[in-house]
């Protein structure tokens, strides 16, 4: 599924290679068979807007959004296991899956990094890839909602992934979780000021 490769690349740290290979991304988007016209257009707009930004500004915003704090971390197991011991075993298991399909990791890459997981899914037959997306759909929906709350354009990528997964995510539960997080944050801020 070429769409997973495109979204994977757009969820990586923006760099000069993104600018250098932009035409390949637009060509891949044009060849998509799994996106309707509206979704392909949204993805194209996101890509154009990202490329139009100053690279250093895009990098700073990316780091602020995805590298600081757990709420919008692109490390999938962060949202499932937190800092528990189960996270380590889950990573070992995922690395085993990658190796079974011939994917070799760079020693600096964590196996639960969403762009890497999407690259892995893109190599699988469509039904297996969709199953893998469905497995993480609740995390994707939660991340998308948190990004919408922050008014980030990256939210469109998560909405698209949930739609591609064709998963039934309880949007009411996601909204309640986001509202609860906002309430707790507000309470902490108010209690820290005498």
Locate each region found by the language model.
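A structured, charge-rich N-terminal accessory region that forms the first stable segment of a protein
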Residues: 2-56
């Amino acid at each position: 599924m070429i769409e997973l490769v495109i979204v994977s690349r757009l969820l990586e740290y923006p760099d000069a290679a993104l600018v250098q290979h932009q035409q390949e991304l637009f060509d891949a988007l044009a060849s998509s068979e799994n996106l309707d016209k509206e979704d392909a257009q949204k993805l194209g707009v996101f890509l154009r807007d990202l490329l139009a930004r100053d690279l250093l500004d895009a990098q700073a915003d990316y780091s602020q959004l995805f590298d600081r704090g757990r709420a919008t971390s692109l490390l999938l197991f962060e949202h499932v296991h937190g800092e528990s011991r189960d996270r380590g075993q889950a990573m070992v298991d995922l690395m085993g899956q990658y190796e079974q399909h011939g994917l070799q990791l760079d020693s600096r890459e964590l196996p639960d990094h969403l762009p890497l997981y999407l690259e892995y899914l893109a190599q699988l037959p469509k039904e297996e890839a969709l199953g893998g997306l469905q497995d993480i759909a609740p995390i994707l929906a939660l991340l998308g909602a948190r990004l919408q709350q922050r008014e980030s354009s990256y939210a469109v990528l998560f909405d698209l992934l949930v739609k591609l997964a064709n998963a039934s995510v309880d949007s009411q539960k996601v909204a309640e979780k986001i509202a609860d997080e906002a309430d707790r944050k507000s309470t902490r801020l108010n209690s820290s000021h005498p």
